[in-house]
Design a protein with these regions (language model features):
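Extended intrinsically disordered or low-complexity regions, especially N/C-terminal cytosolic tails and loops
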Residues: 3, 46-48, 52, 56-298, ...
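Acidic/aromatic/glycine-rich contiguous surface patches that form carbohydrate-binding/processing clefts
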Residues: 306
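Modules that initiate DNA replication and primer synthesis
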Residues: 2-70
Length: 421
């Protein structure tokens, strides 16, 4: 049999059969090599077992990759993304004018959405065109489409189910309202966590200057240079001069007390100082709070930079690379939200985990009733805005699973914010 015949026959094998055939050949080669090298029998067995686990993992990874590719092909069946624009020049690679995806006019953007099953019944095409040209760009608006389910069969396979352009506009507006509410909450968490550190310094009779010197001394050479360099730049008269805090920093730069440092530190460096204080005072609760504050800082940055949030509230959203903080999970247990599959699924979503950190921090750091009441009112208005469109979005058990993520967030608001009022 020729080599081409053998290759042709191998293509008729199933993925599993081909995997077994390949593994058997590799085992023989691997075993003979180990024998030639004088490996003992037990070492040979251990090596072959290790190889078996490796190839099994490789096979499973390949199967998962192929399944994902098949899913992507299914979802993109009705999408014109892979089709070249007939009005533009394209080469044999499918690229258009040197780019994989050309810029679309507003008219083409609407046509693209229609080809994916998006309807224009609640908002007509002319109004949609004005929205895309004046209110919000196409990239951000269409990003919310991932929250809706697609047809999995029939003539309209791959198209979105019951998705109108008005739904994208509504979610874009709700997302903007979320960012505004979250950002204000983040600002208060930063402020009151700094107030807590200052109060703890006073309670522990810390020398306000000595603690800052100790903090700087325990930093690495690069960390210290980076921190001092940033402060000097803000205090200088150059381009990076801070017109709000620069004069204060300049006045105390060479001998800075803790109350000035807390005013000068941005949120990120402050979390490092918070951890330093936790270690200095051997306070395990503060150590855990430090990790929560880092999550709040990440959410604050996203809100301040106007990043979309709601479009990631799905099971496909980016996963948190860490287990939920004990302070948060213990509080959830105390409030009756136990360690269920639903809770684990929601908190595995990085955005939900950061939102949970913010809401817990509001309860933990913002102890003034007037502060909590102010935030409770804002969250109530945000919830009303979402609930006003609930009929369009469906219920938790419907295909649009993002609704259950919002429901989980409302539960967190109830236990950590609303119940405090």
């Amino acid at each position: 049999m020729s080599q081409n015949d053998r290759l042709a026959n191998s293509e008729t094998l199933s993925g599993k059969d081909l995997y077994i055939h390949t593994e058997a050949v590799l085992f023989l080669v691997w075993g003979k090599l180990l024998i030639l090298l004088g490996i003992s029998s037990q070492e040979l067995i251990d090596a072959l077992c290790s190889s078996a686990f490796h190839w099994n993992d490789l096979y499973r990874s390949q199967q998962m990759y192929r399944a994902k590719e098949q899913e992507n092909r299914l979802c993109n069946t009705a999408s014109p993304d892979n089709q070249p624009d007939k009005s533009s020049s394209s080469d044999e690679t499918g690229q258009i004018n040197g780019h994989m995806k050309p810029a679309l006019t507003v008219t083409q953007q609407i046509s693209h959405l229609k080809s994916q099953g998006v309807t224009f019944k609640l908002i007509d095409e002319s109004e949609a065109a004005r929205y895309l040209a004046e209110a919000n760009n196409y990239l951000r608006t269409r990003s919310y489409r991932v929250l809706f389910s697609r047809q999995t069969g029939g003539a309209h396979i791959g198209e979105y189910v019951n998705l109108d352009f008005a739904d994208l506009v509504t979610l874009s507006r709700i997302d903007r309202e979320m960012r505004e509410v979250f950002l204000l909450a983040c600002i208060d968490v930063e402020h009151f966590s700094k107030m807590r550190v200052l109060r703890l310094c006073e309670e522990r009779h810390e020398d306000g200057y000595a603690i800052v010197s100790s903090f700087a001394a325990q930093l690495s050479h690069n960390e210290r240079n980076h921190l001092l360099g940033a402060l000097r730049a803000r205090a200088s008269e150059g381009k990076r001069h801070d017109i709000y805090s620069g004069d204060l920093i300049a006045h105390y730069l060479d001998d800075m007390p803790v109350w000035v440092l807390l005013e000068a530190l941005e949120f990120g460096p402050f979390t490092n100082f918070y951890l330093f204080c936790a270690d200095r005072w051997n306070d395990e609760t503060m150590r855990q709070e430090h990790y929560v504050l880092k999550s709040v800082k990440a959410l604050r940055n996203a809100c301040a930079h106007d990043s979309c949030i709601a479009n990631g509230l799905t099971t496909a959203g980016e996963r948190a690379g860490y287990a939920p903080n004990l302070l948060i999970t213990n509080s959830l247990n105390d409030h009756g939200i136990h360690n269920s599959r639903s809770r684990r699924t929601k908190l595995r979503n990085l955005r939900v985990a950061q939102i949970a950190a913010l809401l817990w921090s509001l309860s933990a750091f913002c102890t003034r009733d007037s502060t909590i009441e102010r935030h409770a009112i804002r969250f109530a208005r945000l919830r009303e805005s979402f609930e006003a469109n609930r009929e369009r979005f469906g219920n938790d058990d419907d295909a649009n699973a993002f609704v259950s993520y919002f429901e989980f967030i409302w539960k967190l608001v109830d236990i950590w914010v609303s119940q405090r009022v």
